[in-house]
Amino acid sequence: LAYEYAPEKRKGFFGSIPQAGVTIGMLMATFIVSLMTLFDEAQFLAWGWRIPFLLSSVLVFLGLWIRKDIDETPAFKQVKKSGQVAKAPLRDTLKHHWREVLIAAGLKVVETAPFYIFSTFVVSYATTTLSYQKSQALESVTLGALVATVMIPLMGLLSDKVGRQKMYTLSVVLLGLFIVPWFLLLDTGTGWGIMLATIVAFGILWAPVTAVLGTLCSEIFSANVRYTGITLGYQLGAALAGGTAPLIATGLLAKYDGDWRPVAVYLGVTVAISLLAIFCASRMKSAPDVASSRAARA
């Protein structure tokens, strides 16, 4: 929706705004948890635990209100007017656009696996394998999320000038190059080490990847199957490399006696998969279905 409603020269910026929802959610959750520390244990167990759920209900109603007043996008209305709406979008997407789905999934891999490594796995790794205090790890992740929240729309805006594919490719390469330094910084055992590692990896290098991902995937699919195609690609990539990432990383640490190098190799594989995906996406640039949809949007 953000992509299709956006002006032609601002699609990267508008497409990046929803992507910031993840880090904004992390910051909101951190704030709520911080408020809960104002209660003693008895108060929290008696009634305090209900407060986060009550506050989240406000977001539910806000989402329903927004959804209620959203109309179909101009691009989809044009498809509908021309009679090209897919009667069975899931079937048509899997039959005619399965390559695009795989590419979208591949693009998602390096966005989702490092996210969970840099924001979730790092807390466990820093406090169990290394000698950090839990507060140090959580503070570094919170600061990384804050930096990412600022960086995401800025990178989306920049992508409108330099191009989505160039920004994605450069960001993924830099992310891959920083994998080993990330572990080395953590191994210093210092507060500045974990803070710098998390801010650079999560806040600076991961941010442009997620900033352009939504717009990049939107440009792969034609308007009549765009929603279905992106959803399939996103969910497939997230299922393969999302929530499983901390489990795989923890399993590798356990198997290799705390050696971080196998985890670094695993992250390197996610980088390679997404670089292959962006290469394939660039080769599909002039595909008839994509080209025609772009012409229709022009």
Where are these regions (language model features)?
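Glycine-rich segments within core transmembrane alpha-helices of 12-TM secondary carriers
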Residues: 10-37, 231-245
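Helix-loop-helix hairpin linking two adjacent transmembrane segments in secondary transporters
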Residues: 22-67
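A membrane-interface helix-boundary motif in multi-pass transporters
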Residues: 38-54, 251-269
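Multi-pass alpha-helical transporter architecture, strongest
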Residues: 63-70, 216, 268-297
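Extracytoplasmic gate region of multi-pass secondary transporters
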Residues: 98-147, 241-246
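Helix-to-loop junctions at the C-terminal end of transmembrane segments
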Residues: 152-164
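Cytoplasmic membrane-interface "Motif A"-like loop-to-helix N-cap segments
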Residues: 161-173
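C-terminal ends and interior cores of transmembrane alpha-helices
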Residues: 173-189
